[in-house]
């Protein structure tokens, strides 16, 4: 049975829908320990066998933030400041994660997040990991 986990930034400019066969309590919730993710209290959610669609209602109020190795687009709403998730192109395909804290019930049904440390990974290792565990994604800009 397919479940759709929906999320939105505070003002609704950015939305996400993760289609998965997994039950929420069985999904692997991660808490990256980099400064950026910790400052946003990010708990990331993905399913390599699922499908993620992130939509932007007003592109003038949308920011793709980059830092570190500049490999990933961190998707931030300029209106409310929320970070809904991130995407990266790997081998011509887009992969993404969503912020479980911005999903319905604010991620309460997912349980505790596993703290993850990625600073020792090379860019190639990061791309391989993301391709393996992030969700195949589309980014749709409405206007």
Regions of interest found by a model, annotated:
Residues 1-8, 13-143:
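A short Gly-Trp-Pro
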């Amino acid at each position: 049975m397919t479940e759709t986990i929906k999320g939105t930034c505070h003002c609704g400019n950015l939305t996400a829908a993760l289609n998965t066969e997994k039950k929420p309590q069985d999904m692997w919730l991660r808490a990256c320990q980099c400064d950026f993710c910790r400052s946003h209290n990010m708990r990331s959610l993905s399913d390599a066998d699922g499908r993620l669609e992130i939509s932007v209602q007003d592109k003038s109020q949308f920011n793709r933030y980059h830092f570190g190795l500049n490999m990933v687009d961190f998707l931030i709403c300029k209106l409310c400041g929320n970070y809904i998730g991130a995407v990266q192109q790997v081998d011509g395909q887009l992969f993404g994660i969503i912020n479980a804290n911005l999903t319905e019930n604010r991620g309460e049904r997912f349980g505790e997040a596993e703290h993850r440390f990625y600073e020792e990974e090379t860019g190639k290792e990061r791309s391989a990991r993301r391709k393996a565990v992030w969700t195949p994604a589309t980014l749709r800009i409405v206007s």
